[in-house]
Every structure is written in C-alpha cells, then in structure tokens.
Amino acid sequence: MDATDPTLYRSPVAAAAAAPEQIAYVAAFDPAGQMKDALAVLDCDPSSSTYGGVVGWAELPTAGNELHHFGWNACSSALCHEGHGGHDGDHHGLERRYLLVPGIRSSNTYVLDTKPDPRRPVITHTIEANELATKAGYSRPHTVHCG
C-alpha cells in the first residue's frame, strides 16, 4: 500500500473532522427464512441521485443466519494505538477492506471483500461453525470487533 488508508485516523478529532461515509452496509433478510440472507449497500450521499437507495447487494449462501454486529478487519482508530503503525510510521498494510459478518443463529462468519468496488462486496471466505468451535472454542458469534 503506497499511502495510509484514508479511513484510518490518528485521533478521534481527526475522525470527527473526516468526510462522512458515502455508503452503508446493512443486513438484509427474509423474516420467513425462505430467501437467502444478504448484505445491502445503501447510498448515504445526500447529493447523489440514488441517495437512500440500495446501490449494491451481496447474497449469502444460506438463509436464517441472523447477521449480527458486523465490522471491519481494521478499526478506523488503528493508527491511534501503539504497535498498529500510528507511532512508528510503518502501517503494516493496514486497510479497512474486509467486512467480518457473523451469523448468530448459524454460527458462521462471512468475510466480504469490499475492494475493488465497495458497492459490490464479494464473499471471499466463510468461517464455518465447526471451525469456529474447534479452533476457538466459540459458538454463536455475537459481535465482531476489528483488528
């Protein structure tokens, strides 16, 4: 990476002064459980002609996951913390790129890549329930905290 990810900040003041997000990722599901779950991408730019609308969609392989408290692979505050590149000038390739999306009912965690097009995230990996239980001793992932 030739430059620091512009969505990573050295202080809360810098984060508050940054431009607002242009899109938002929102869990989408069928309450009846007949259709597959998805991650909807919403346009949050008030000056956009598609403001408030769904501008992207990533369908998951199954229904009934109950997606819950998902987050990024790297916190926007990563540069504030010792050892994360904020103090020694080495950013170690930090980039807010992957969404980690847990399903509290399925116990699966989906990894979605938001590059090269943030409006079209793609599932790159699924951490299956049995892998989570075997390797970490956990089930029912509730909240994913970043990096």
Outline where the language-model segments fall.
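Sequence/structural signature of beta-propeller modules
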Residues: M1-S47
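A short beta-strand motif characteristic of beta-propeller blades
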Residues: T4-D5, V55-T62, H125-K135
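Repetitive beta-architecture junctions, highlighting loop-to-beta-strand starts
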Residues: Q22, D37, G53, R97, ...
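Short loop/turn segments immediately following beta-strands, especially the blade-tip
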Residues: V41-T50, V111-V122
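General structural concept
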Residues: A40-D45, T50-C80, R97
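Short loop/turn segments immediately following the C-termini of beta-strands
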Residues: F29-P31, P102-R105, T114
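Structural signature of eukaryotic scaffold interfaces centered on beta-propeller domains
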Residues: M1-P20, E66-E95, G137-G147
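Asp-box/WD-like beta-propeller blade repeats and closely related beta-sheet repeat scaffolds
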Residues: T114-G147
